[in-house]
UniProtKB/Swiss-Prot annotation:
This is Sodium/hydrogen exchanger 1. Predicted models used for more than 20 years predicted 10-12 transmembrane segments. More recently, the structure of SLC9A1 has been solved and reveals that SLC9A1 possesses 13 transmembrane regions. The modification Phosphoserine is found at S603, S606, S609, S652, S697, S701, S707, S727, S730, S733, S792, S794, S803. Activated at acidic pHs. Inhibited by amiloride and 5-amino-substituted derivatives. Inhibited by cariporide and eniporide. Phosphatidylinositol 4,5-bisphosphate (PI(4,5)P2) and phosphatidylinositol 3,4,5-trisphosphate (PI(3,4,5)P3) bind and differentially regulate SLC9A1 activity. GO terms for biological process: cellular response to acidic pH; protein complex oligomerization; regulation of intracellular pH; regulation of pH; response to acidic pH; sodium ion export across plasma membrane; sodium ion import across plasma membrane. Residues 513-520, 556-564 are annotated as: PI(4,5)P2-binding region. Electroneutral Na(+) /H(+) antiporter that extrudes Na(+) in exchange for external protons driven by the inward sodium ion chemical gradient, protecting cells from acidification that occurs from metabolism. Exchanges intracellular H(+) ions for extracellular Na(+) in 1:1 stoichiometry. Plays a key role in maintening intracellular pH neutral and cell volume, and thus is important for cell growth, proliferation, migration and survival. In addition, can transport lithium Li(+) and also functions as a Na(+)/Li(+) antiporter. One of its GO terms (cellular component) is cytoplasm. Residues 637-822 are annotated as: Interaction with CALM1. It comes from Cricetulus griseus.
Length: 822
């Protein structure tokens, strides 16, 4: 039976071992919790709930309850004295003791993290499940099972508190997204992202709030008392796309970069709109009447929240970059500054009710180029993997606690309100994407196709941010908050399970372009930067200031001022690819000397000596070792930063101040003549003849010979070579009629007086061009193809250097082709 079950599911005992281990650990922990009377309170400020009041005495390492309870057989009483006459008996020292309250908090946190990690391992070792169901769905199911198990044994399941989510679980995910944000794709599509994030979120919030208010008016007695302000607050919570859910789903389907950055960028930037609307409607709930000034201040607060969060992030990013200048002697603490300054930016933004997500993104984007230029490669690797690990664990815990909190929370169900909420969310998303895309495509060069619009609309997933904001609602001002929370959980489960599970087959069905898995080559990087500089120059010439122009201005300012302040030492200057090459060569030479292989290399490098070192039998192996990923990444960084400075070495110009150099034309003509002479000498040395070439005449095409042979009139001051076309019997035969020129070209001059080249030859070869003319027949009856009697065809057979004579004529064709001049 076990073999049949394993064969059906494709599982083996090693694969199910992590899951069984987690189940055994949970089942074993529950009796311990029950025996010690640990009842986590759902109203606690932490995940596990509030602890009983405890007091700590001065100088003590451990804590003790304020009111200790004494038991008759308590083993912790080590100073128990039993007097029996004059003799005092003392109880033995306890070898083993249990104090769970002392380690309760870190133990439970570690257990939940261990559960999250083991669940991720278990999902990925079972490909039949992970290929069909997204990881986020499986984690929510695990949370539901764990919550039901805890509730089944009589315990209170832990609840995902909003403070824990916003202060501890959300920042690692946003920092990872902001620090490794693909900046090029993000900036190129920033306008589209802002329209979807701002206008789209506002449309969803007010459209959903207005329709739900109309439903509440006619929905029955249970929801008749829900006002317009309540539905608008609920609409602002449920309308925002969640970045955690988007990251979890879109990274598994490997969608192309454009769609990924549009949906993910929208989920990041709509936080400012969500925060403003939430606090705005929450404040309006305390007012008796709302005036025009209140609405205007609420509109102004949007810019304050968004731009204030960006400003806080930029300030902390600059401070982090400046601090990294002085960490060259203490490399161990370099990664710590990145985490601390980013987290301080988030907390500072939340302190003033600004957008903490915008602050984290801004700090990560600003600090990354300068910090990576200052820190070591090992520190960069540490930052990369720690952020990935931290964000992955936080994301896993969030989805698990969504399932646990669903079991632990109090719910209120109303079919009309919940189904209307789900239906209106889908309608608002589809209408918003269609209308906004129609407007955006009027200004985009790369249009968004109907397939792209469908993926954008279908990828609007909701997640833990909406759940946490719904949990923060005050029951005093919003008495139907339990109904709102139930509707939020329903929408989250529908988007994560239904849309998240079906988006992968839909992407395959629609043949949507996938993400390029391999990195771009260095050649592609060079050509991309080349096109950027080309477009910048075109914008300058045309007088049109697009984003390439402002990007170039920002790069110039960055190089002139910012880099000198934030990057230490010589690294603040322009990095050179040649310097990196010398560094790499020096490292290889040192390794070669240390390995003792220097004596095998001869002092004089030649082709023969290199062949002796590397025999022909090893020709298939590469002489030079392949570049490692680290070196290739460093070359990419050098090229990115170095190619941005190419235009700065040129003098400034525009279309109105073009000054011609008087010596430039003469210099170019001289260089051109030298180049022509060099090419002519090379052809003479290779083919022992002169290519018949006339620049002023049109190119001879492969036309068939008619009654009259084709001829071109040469210049009077140029020598003439008359050429007989090749006969069908000897297609390689060429008749050079001018014998003196032939001897001059071949270096076989029969006249001793013409051995030296005189002024007449220099005049003839002034331009380094030899003119060509076809031989005219002496009489109408003379055959054009008959060679002169004084020259035999075999003596005139030379290598074909003039042109390709073309294919042999077909059997039915008696007319050969005219050779085309090179």
């Amino acid at each position: 039976m076990m073999l049949r079950w394993s064969g059906i599911w494709g599982l083996s005992p090693p694969r199910i071992f992590p899951s069984l281990l987690v189940v055994v650990a949970l089942v074993g922990l529950l009796p311990v919790l029950r025996s010690h009377g640990l009842q986590p309170s759902p109203t606690a400020n932490t995940i596990r709930g509030a602890e009983p009041p405890r007091e700590r005495s001065i100088g003590d390492v451990t804590t003790a309850p304020s009111e200790p309870v004494h038991h008759p057989d308590d083993r912790n009483l080590t100073n128990l004295h039993i007097e029996h006459g004059a003799k005092t008996l003392r109880k033995a020292f306890p070898v083993l003791d249990i104090d769970y309250l002392h380690v309760r908090t870190p133990f439970e946190i570690s257990l939940w993290i261990l559960l999250a990690c083991l669940m991720k391992i278990g999902f990925h070792v079972i490909p039949t499940i992970s290929s069909i169901v997204p990881e986020s769905c499986l984690l929510i199911v695990v949370g539901l099972l764990v919550g039901g198990l805890i509730k089944g044994v009589g315990e209170t399941p832990p609840f995902l508190q909003s403070d824990v989510f916003f202060l501890f679980l959300l920042p690692p995910i946003i920092l990872d997204a902001g620090y490794f944000l693909p900046l090029r794709q993000f900036t190129e599509n920033l306008g589209t992202i802002l329209i979807f994030a701002v206008v789209g979120t506002l449309w969803n919030a007010f459209f959903l709030g207005g329709l739900l208010y109309a439903v509440c008016l006619v929905g029955g007695e249970q929801i008749n008392n829900i006002g317009l302000l309540d539905t608008l607050l609920f609409g602002s919570i449920i309308s925002a796309v969640d970045p955690v859910a988007v990251v979890a789903v879109f990274e598994e389907i490997h969608i192309n970069e454009l769609l990924h950055i549009l949906v993910f960028g929208e989920s990041l930037l709509n936080d400012a709109v969500t925060v403003v609307l939430y606090h705005l409607f929450e404040e309006f709930a305390n007012y008796d009447s709302i005036g025009i000034s209140d609405i205007f201040l609420g509109f102004l607060s949007f810019f304050v929240v968004a731009l204030g969060g960006v400003f806080v992030g930029v300030v902390y990013g600059v401070i982090a970059a400046f601090t990294s200048r002085f960490t060259s002697h203490i490399r161990v603490i370099e990664p710590l500054f990145v985490f601390l300054y980013s987290y301080m930016a988030y907390l500072s933004a939340e302190l003033f009710h600004l957008s903490g997500i915008m602050a984290l993104i801004a700090s990560g984007v600003v600090m990354r180029p300068y910090v990576e230029a200052n820190i070591s490669h090992k520190s960069h690797t540490t930052i990369k993997y720690f952020l990935k690990m931290w964000s992955s664990v936080s994301e896993t815990l969030i989805f698990i606690f969504l399932g646990v909190s669903t079991v632990a929370g109090s719910h209120q169900w109303n079919w009309t309100f919940v189904i209307s909420t789900l239906l209106f969310c889908l309608i608002a998303r589809v209408l918003g994407v269609l209308v906004l895309t129609w407007f955006i495509n009027k200004f985009r060069i790369v249009k968004l196709t109907p397939k792209d619009q469908f993926i954008i609309a279908y990828g609007g997933l909701r997640g833990a941010i909406a759940f946490s904001l719904g949990y923060l609602m005050d029951k005093k001002h919003f008495p139907m908050c339990d109904l709102f929370l139930t509707a939020i959980i329903t929408v989250i489960f529908f988007t994560v399970f239904v849309q998240g599970m079906t988006i992968r087959p839909l992407v395959d069905l629609l043949a949507v372009k996938k993400k390029q898995e391999t990195k771009r080559s260095i050649n592609e990087e060079i050509h991309t930067q080349f096109l950027d500089h080309l477009l910048t120059g075109i914008e300058d010439i045309c007088g049109h200031y697009g984003h390439h122009h402002w990007k170039d201005k920002l790069n110039r300012f960055n190089k002139k001022y910012v880099k000198k302040c934030l990057i230490a030492g010589e690294r603040s200057k322009e990095p050179q690819l040649i310097a990196f090459y010398h560094k790499m060569e020096m490292k290889q030479a040192i390794e070669l000397v240390e390995s003792g292989g220097m004596g095998k290399i001869p002092s004089a490098v030649s082709t023969v000596s290199m062949q002796n070192i590397h025999p022909k039998s090893m020709a298939s192996e590469r002489i030079l070792p392949a570049l490692s990923k680290d070196k290739e990444e460093e070359i990419r960084k050098i090229l990115r930063s170095n190619l941005q400075k190419t235009r700065q070495r040129l003098r400034s110009y525009n279309r109105h101040t073009l000054v011609a150099d008087p010596y430039e034309e003469a210099w170019n003509q001289m260089l051109l003549r030298r180049q022509k002479a060099r090419q002519l000498e090379q052809k003479m040395s290779n083919y022992l003849t002169v290519p018949a070439h006339k620049l002023d005449s049109p190119t001879m095409s492969r036309a068939r010979i008619g009654s009259d042979p084709l001829a071109y009139e040469p210049k009077a001051d140029l020598p003439v070579i008359t050429i007989d076309p090749a006969s069908p019997q000897s297609p390689e035969s060429v008749d050079l009629v001018n014998e003196e020129l032939k001897a001059k070209v071949l270096g076989v001059n029969r006249d001793p007086t013409r051995l030296t080249r005189g002024e007449e030859d220099e005049d003839e070869d002034e331009d380094g061009v030899i003119m060509m003319r076809r031989k005219e027949p002496s009489s109408p009856g003379t055959d054009v193809f008959t060679p002169a009697p004084m020259y035999s065809p075999s003596s005139q057979r030379i290598q074909r250097c003039l042109s390709d004579p073309g294919p042999h004529p077909e059997p039915g064709e008696g007319e050969p082709f005219i050779p085309k001049g090179e």
